[in-house]
Amino acid sequence: KLSRTGHTSWTLEEIDFEDGPYQDENITDTTLTPSHTTGSSRTITASAVTGINGGHGFQTTDVGRLISIGHQAAAWAASTSYSVGAVVRNSGNVYECIKAGTSAGSGGPSGEGDEIVDNNCTWKFLRDGGIQWGYAKVTGRTSTTEVTVTVNETFGGTSAETKWRLGAFSETTGFPAAVAFYEQRLFFAGTTEQPQTLFGSKSGDYENHTPGTLDDDPVIYTLA
């Protein structure tokens, strides 16, 4: 991206996309298993190559690509101490603790919002569905079924999961050939693998492609 911070001050740098955009969620039986929930020089291991790059598995061109894996979030618990960053599921939704404290004796967070009070805890609605999605960036390829990664958003566990999705932009899939601003979103389109798909950012947050269900969340649309 090209940034202008002064009359004669210009900077050209690579965009660091936040959590996406992604291709469609996996529908095969192939699982991905992260070795750790956080950190760098971690590994993600696939149970098979099915569903990964057209059945060819991980490629060296996947370096720099994002991988997102979903685990069931921990259930909210009554009268429990939570620290900032803790993620729980309650009432069919997923919430992140943004103010540490002790949860209420019953009920817990519900609905959508950025500051949901739960006794002296405060929660932020993340998404519906009860799944905690973490994501990592590929830093190396060991084989067609294993890559090394840096975890950017904490995974919900280290179990093998079929809920995963691969980044839409990479040397493997191609990068967008077209870009435009529209209604406070930054849209990208024209990748080699998905030439008819539009990827729109979160409203007013041009590098944020975190999947969600709110009105201002990122959008993906494929022309028929």
Language model feature labels by segment:
Residues 161-185, 189-224:
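Beta-propeller and closely related beta-pinwheel folds
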Residues 18, 26-28, 33, 111-113, ...:
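Generic preference for flexible, low-structure residues
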Residues 98, 109-111, 199:
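A generic "cationic amphipathic patch" detector
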Residues 25, 42, 47, 114-115, ...:
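Residue-level marker of intrinsically disordered, low-complexity segments enriched
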Residues 105-117, 121:
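Short, tandemly repeated low-complexity microdomains enriched for cysteine and small residues
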Residues 1-2, 179:
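Broad, structure-driven detector of short, well-ordered beta-strand segments within folded domains
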Residues 2-4, 9-104, 122-159:
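Autoprocessing Asn-cyclization modules and mimics
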